[in-house]
Each structure stands twice: as C-alpha cells, then as structure tokens.
Amino acid sequence: TCPSLYDLRNLFQVNVEEGRHLWAMVYLLHAHFGRDGREEGEALLARRSGDADNPRILTAFNEKTPDWLSFFMFTFITDRDGKYQLAALAESGFDPLSRTCRFMLTEEAHHMFVGESGIARIIQRTCDAMKEHKTEDAARLRGLGVIDLPTLQKYLNFHYSVTSDLYGSEISSNAASFYANGLKGRFEETKLADDHRLHGSEYPYMEVTGDQIVVNHAPALTALNERLRDDWVTDVQAGVSRWNRIPEKAGIAFRFT
C-alpha cells in the first residue's frame, strides 16, 4: 500500500521519467554511434535491476527497494547522484548529449523533491508522536505506527554509502581523458573561475594510509571523480541539515549526520 494517492502518483511519475531517461540514452547510441552504439543500446535495454544473469552494471541500481522509506531515500540520495552526473555530461562538447542531459536534469529535480519531502513528512510525524507520547523508545514508537529516528539514520547511512560508490575511483585517468576531450565537464563548469584546462592544478582527496585517513593532493584532471563526489556530498548535507530543523524545532535532541 502507498502512504497516499499523492505518493502513488509520484512513484508512477518517477518510474515513467526514469524509463524515458533510459530510452533517451538508447536513442543517442542508435542515432550517433553506428553498429557499436546499437549493440550497446540493446544491452542497456536488456539489463534488469537485481537480475541474477543480467543485472545493472552499478551495484546501487541492483539494491532492493522493498518499502517506501527506501524509495524516498533513493530519490533523495541516489537521484542526486544523477543530478551531478547529468550536469557534468550537460557540459559536453557533443551537443546531442548535452541537450539531452539538460532536459533530464529538470525531471531529476522533481525526483529529489519527492525524496526530500517524503522523508521530511516521516520525520515530522515521528517527532509529533515522540512529543505527544513523551517517548524515544523505538519499539513503542513503531507500535504507534511511526518510524523511529535511529532507523531513519540507518537507511540514510546505507543509501549514502552505496551511492557514494557510483563516482568511481578517486583518481581516474578515464575521467581526465573524458574532460580533456570535451566529453564531460565539472558541475556548473561555466561558473568556475579558472582556465578550465586544469594544467598544473591540484585537488585534495582523502585516502587510508595504515590506520589513518590522510589528505593527499593529486592533479586536478585525474581527481575529477572526487571533485564531483564532493559537490554531491555538500548537496546531500544541505538536505540533511533541512531535515534536522524538524527535531530541532520540536525540542528533540536527535540530529541526522
């Protein structure tokens, strides 16, 4: 069952639009890349999320979505990855790809709204129940028909982790090649105040050395994946901060991190 007809309509709209995004990419492959493009397009259409024999390439898109909380987290966090990947491709010098991605970005904005507002409603209802019944006990809150805040945090942790992997290796020669050849840009490339060639520039990234996380620097061209991930992290944090206003306003100490 769905929380409301409004949510059911949003679910249908998100699914229809994501299907349209798939077909848009298949069209580009068929229209501009000859026989190889047609074969890749057919392979895209053949893949199924979670299928044992022909799954999606990226792990995050094979994870199950068994409940509405998972759906809202997916649209808030994982569709936000889509925003940044599409924005980078919208900077492409290949005009058909650029125009297609710009159109898709308008639909991704709605998907993220569905996720953020859906989770916000859940948090609000939980905080209302906590205040009304003066309890933070998870079992009692679940008995009242709401989702306790620590469980929401666990869902947030999971979806954040699997989505973070979508950006690939922090240091990538492929990312450098795509950028140097004009296939892909950075998020809001035209707003960045540099030479847009990145020769001699560096970018910080974190890695594990021994038992510590240390900050290193790499050529900016090879660290483009990490830069895009950092942009995404900042945006996710902004949404989480908006969620945190709800328990803060209710006088509840819990904060999402």
Annotate the PLM regions.
Residues 33-70, 74, 134-139, 154-158, ...:
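Carboxylate-rich helix-loop segments that flank metal/cofactor sites and access channels
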Residues 131-257:
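Extended, helix-rich structural scaffolds rather than catalytic motifs
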Residues 2, 7, 31-40, 122-131:
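Short, glycine/acidic-rich hinge or "gate" loops at secondary-structure transitions
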Residues 1-13, 81-98:
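Helix-loop segments that flank and shape redox-cofactor active sites
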Residues 92-156:
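Glycine- and acidic-residue-rich phosphate-binding/metal-coordinating active-site segment common to enzymes
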